[in-house]
C-alpha cells in the first residue's frame, strides 16, 4: 500500500501537539540550508575568506556527527518531550548568538552549538509525531516528510529574504521562529513514554560491525562529500545576490523533496534499490563535472538539477541503512549517520582549500570522483547490501527516529 494513499485522508486531522512538532520541524530543517544564500555576504561582512565561512557547515555537521552517539542515549533517559525542548533551547540560544557575531570564529562556534540543538530536536521529532498522531504511522510519516521537504526548500528562501537586508537577520529570524516552536511544544505536547530499553553510547558503533551497514555507511560517506560540496561551495562559485542565490537553492530544495518523497520509491519498485542508487550516483558525478566546467547558466541549471539526484540518493541510502542489518532502526541509523556526517563536515573545509591549491574547477572534479567511489562501493559490496535491500518493500526514508538528516 502506498503510504500516501493510506495517510491522505487523515493527515490534516491531527492534534495540536502534532502540528506544533511538525511546525518546529520545518524551521529545524530550514536551518540546514539557511546560510547558503548569505555565505558571500557573511564573508564580506566579517572580512573572511570562503574557506573560513564554509566552516559554518563544518562545525555544524561535525557536531551533528558526534551527536548521533548521544541523541538516543539522551532521549531514552529523559523522554521525547524534554529532548525536543532541550534541542529547541540550544537552537534559540545559539542561532540568536550567531546573529551577534563580530568574528567568523564566533559565528562558527555558535553554529556548532546550533548543530547540537538541531540534532537533539530533529532526531526525536519523528518518533514524537508518530506517537501523538491520529490516523496511524502512515499519516504521521507523510506529515513529517512534508515538513522536511518544506523546510529544505524554504531555508534558502528565508535566508535570501532576510539576508538581503543583513546577513545577521536570518539567524535572528530562526531564533524567533524556534522560540515560538518551544512555546507551542511546551503548551501542547504531553510527555511521551520512554523506551523499554535505554540506548548506550556505544550501541551505534557496535552496529557498524555488520558488513552491510558498514558498506552503506562508507558509500554514503563518499556521496555526502559530493552533496556538501554542492551545498556549501557552489554559492561562492555562483557569486549571486542573496535573492538570486536563494531562488536557485529553493528550486534545488523543491527537486530534492519531490524526488525523495515521490519519485525515489517508485523507481525502487521498478528497478531495485541498488540499481537506482548506482545510476543516480553516476548521474550526480556527471552533473557536478558540468557544474564545475560549464558557464554560469550551466552551473545554475546543474546546481538545481543536483537536487533530484540528491533526493533519490538520500531515500535509498537511508532505507539501506535501516534494512540491511538486524540492529534496531534508531541504533543502525545512528551508526550510519555517525560515519557519513563526517564527510558533510569535511567537504565545506576542503573544497575551498582545493580551490586555493589548484583552481575553481578541481573541487568539482574531486566531488565527481567521490560520487563515483560511492557507486564503486555499492557495486563491490552489492552482495552484502543485497541480502535484504532488494527484498525490501520501499518505505519512506524518514521512518525512523534518527534518520531525519538523511533527507
Where do the model's predicted regions map?
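A late C-terminal transmembrane helix in Major Facilitator Superfamily
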Residues: 324-360
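C-terminal transmembrane helical hairpin of 12-TM major facilitator-type secondary transporters
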Residues: 274-317
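Helix-loop-helix hairpin linking two adjacent transmembrane segments in secondary transporters
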Residues: 135, 142-186
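Cytoplasmic helix-loop-helix junction between adjacent transmembrane helices
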Residues: 110-150
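Juxtamembrane intracellular "pre-TM" segments in multi-pass secondary transporters
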Residues: 2-12, 190-216
Amino acid at each position: 500500500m502506498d503510504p500516501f494513499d493510506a495517510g491522505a485522508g487523515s493527515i490534516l486531522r491531527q492534534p495540536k501537539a502534532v502540528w506544533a512538532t511538525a511546525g518546529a520541524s520545518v524551521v529545524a530543517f530550514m536551518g540546514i540550508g539557511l546560510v547558503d544564500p548569505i555565505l558571500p555576504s557573511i564573508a564580506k561582512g566579517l572580512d573572511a575568506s570562503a574557506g573560513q565561512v564554509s566552516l559554518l557547515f563544518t562545525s555544524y555537521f561535525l557536531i551533528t556527527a558526534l551527536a548521533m552517539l548521544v541523541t538516543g542515549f539522551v532521549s531514552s533517559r529523559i523522554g521525547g518531550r524534554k529532548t525536543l525542548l532541550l534541542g529547541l533551547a540550544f537552537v534559540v540560544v545559539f542561532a540568536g548568538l550567531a546573529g551577534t557575531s563580530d568574528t567568523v570564529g564566533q559565528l562558527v562556534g555558535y553554529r556548532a552549538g546550533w548543530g547540537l540543538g538541531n540534532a537533539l530536536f530533529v532526531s526525536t521529532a519523528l518518533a514524537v509525531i508518530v506517537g501523538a498522531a491520529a490516523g496511524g504511522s502512515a499519516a504521521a510519516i507523510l506529515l513529517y516528510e512534508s515538513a522536511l521537504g518544506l523546510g529544505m526548500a524554504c531555508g534558502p528562501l528565508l535566508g535570501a529574504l532576510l539576508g538581503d537586508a543583513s546577513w545577521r537577520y536570518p539567524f535572528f529570524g530562526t531564533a524567533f521562529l524556534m522560540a515560538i516552536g518551544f512555546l507551542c511544544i511546551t503548551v501542547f505536547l504531553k510527555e511521551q513514554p520512554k523506551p523499554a530499553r535505554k540506548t548506550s553510547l556505544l550501541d551505534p558503533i557496535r552496529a557498524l560491525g555488520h558488513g552491510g551497514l558498514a558498506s552503506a555507511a562508507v558509500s554514503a560517506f563518499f556521496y555526502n562529500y559530493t552533496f556538501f560540496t554542492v551545498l556549501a561551495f557552489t554559492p561562492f562559485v555562483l557569486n549571486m545576490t542573496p535573492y538570486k542565490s536563494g531562488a536557485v537553492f529553493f528550486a534545488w530544495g523543491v527537486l530534492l523533496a519531490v524526488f525523495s518523497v515521490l519519485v525515489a520509491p517508485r523507481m525502487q519498485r521498478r528497478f531495485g534499490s541498488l540499481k537506482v542508487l548506482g545510476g543516480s550516483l553516476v548521474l550526480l558525478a556527471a552533473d557536478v563535472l558540468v557544474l564545475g566546467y560549464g558557464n554560469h547558466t550551466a552551473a545554475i541549471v546543474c546546481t538545481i538539477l543536483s537536487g533530484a539526484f540528491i533526493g533519490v540518493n538520500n531515500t535509498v541510502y537511508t532505507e539501506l541503512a535501516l534494512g540491511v542489518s538486524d540492529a534496531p532502526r534508531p541504533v543502525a541509523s545512528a551508526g550510519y549517520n555517525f560515519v557519513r556526517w563526517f564527510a558533510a563536515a569535511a567537504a565545506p573545509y576542503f573544497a575551498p582549500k582545493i580551490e586555493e591549491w589548484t583552481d575553481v574547477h578541481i573541487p568539482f572534479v574531486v566531488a565527481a570522483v567521490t560520487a563515483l567511489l560511492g557507486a564503486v562501493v555499492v557495486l563491490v559490496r552489492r552482495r552484502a547490501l543485497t541480502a535484504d535491500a532488494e527484498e525490501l518493500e520501499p518505505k519512506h526514508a524518514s521512518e525512523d527516529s534518527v534518520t531525519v538528516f538523511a533527507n
